[in-house]
Amino acid sequence: MFDPTPCIGPYPFRYVPHPDPDALLGVMDREGIARAWVGHLPSAFYRDTGDGNAQLYTTLSQHHARLKPAPTIRPDWPRWEQALDQAMNAGAGALRVYPPQWQMGPDDDRLRTLAIAAGERKLPIILTVRFEDLRQRHPLDTAGDLPGATIRALARAGAGVRLVVVAAGKDLIEEVNWGLTPAEQQRVLWDISWIWGPPEDHLAKLLRTIGAERFVFGTQWPLRLAQSPRANLELLPDDVRGAGLANAELMFANAIA
């Protein structure tokens, strides 16, 4: 099993215990997760993400067989193209981009330029809808949730773009998916970490209507319990239990323009 969602490093708005590679590997062993793309959590809030990316590369260097870096690239920051080349040299599996935290909207050409450049290098972009529910956020955490319009704009940026959207709920997934053409839908994968299981059964409904091939396993560790997505899969109704989820590692191998 593969998880494209975890991060290491501290979270600025509350204490997170042991957000380090050794703890992550222990969680992965317990949950049967073979490999992961790993981001650097505090870099989402940095103006210059270079130091955070450097720390990520160094910290994961001893675990590259299982933990591939997913560095944070800001297209509004000078020399982001060099940061993209550094990501390639470091063996990155994907890139992380945080439009709400950077006050970048759906019409920002810099986001589309980055998405196209990443696609040319066969690097998916990981978008995070939210870190926490709006009701529990710190007063200083003023960024809103990632809007569906931004996801749609990036999915339409080019045939080579690939997106993994983390922490989306049923309403946002339906809004975005049914607003895209069939070809554009194939460029987007959704993780299941924020999709409700019983009694609402949102996950089952989405698997029936959109298809299991558009969803990937995800924990959003260390901000969420890694056991929750596995429990939701085990509690699926019989007609969708055992439906094979996609593997984000194969996004470009299975590319549909």
Would you name each region that the model predicts?
Residues 1-4, 37-40, 70-72, 96, ...:
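Active-site neighborhood of phospho(di)ester-bond hydrolases with catalytic His/Asp-centered motifs
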Residues 5-11, 128, 167:
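Histidine-centered divalent metal-coordination motifs
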Residues 42-43, 75, 99-101, 131-133, ...:
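Active-site-proximal loop/turn and secondary-structure-junction residues that shape catalytic pockets
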